[in-house]
């Protein structure tokens, strides 16, 4: 169960960064906001909040459709029930992910707490610049090999390319988020149980094959 910061913060100053891509969830809806709690608790914190607001006003512009949708969606009488049901379903998928990937050597991840995505991190000692997955389509194979021959390519990005071409599973390398870790992000949005389990079973098998290649 996800717990809102406002429920536990008490009288301490805090900032919660929100976005409807995760709040609803509505992936790709680039509209976020900041919630300040106990803004006047200290002069320094109040100045920080004002600085963030000033920076936001001159640098950030959210897409218009999500902005217009917020009041209609969040004020709908069924919204909170929908969110409760969605969290239960996402929690179930998180359990399936743990069952299917949790015992695979060479990776680690934490159970989600209401998020519709998860991040899998590789043991970097097991990654090399020569690992691969079998690709049956010769054109795809040539294309992927032309991409990964770049000596500067992050090793998690290399895995992502091979996974997409070999298994038609699309994930996002976490090096693309300016992280020093190497791994990938997956979503838990697939609603069909059989499809979800098949995808993550194939993902797990591909991870093992790749690390052992």
Write out the residue ranges for each language-model feature.
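PLP-dependent class I/II
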Residues: 1-213
């Amino acid at each position: 169960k996800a717990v809102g910061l406002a429920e536990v913060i008490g009288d301490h100053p805090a900032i919660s960064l929100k976005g409807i891509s995760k709040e609803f969830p509505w992936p790709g809806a680039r509209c976020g906001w900041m919630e300040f709690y106990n803004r006047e608790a200290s002069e320094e914190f109040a100045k920080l909040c004002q600085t963030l607001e000033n920076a936001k006003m001159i640098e950030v512009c959210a897409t218009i459709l999500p902005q217009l949708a917020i009041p209609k969606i969040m004020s709908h009488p069924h919204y909170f029930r929908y969110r409760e049901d969605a969290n239960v379903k996402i929690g179930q998928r998180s359990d399936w992910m743990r069952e299917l990937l949790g015992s695979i050597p060479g990776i680690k991840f934490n159970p989600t707490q209401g998020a519709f995505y998860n991040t899998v991190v590789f043991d970097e000692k097991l990654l090399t610049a020569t690992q691969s997955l079998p690709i049956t389509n010769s054109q795809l194979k040539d294309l992927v090999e032309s991409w990964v021959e770049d000596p500067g390519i992050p090793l998690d990005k290399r895995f992502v390319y091979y996974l997409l071409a070999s298994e038609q599973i699309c994930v996002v390398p976490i090096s693309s988020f300016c992280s020093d870790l190497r791994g990938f992000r997956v979503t838990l949005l697939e609603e069909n149980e059989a499809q979800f389990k098949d995808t993550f079973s194939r993902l797990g098998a591909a991870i093992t094959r790749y690390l052992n290649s």
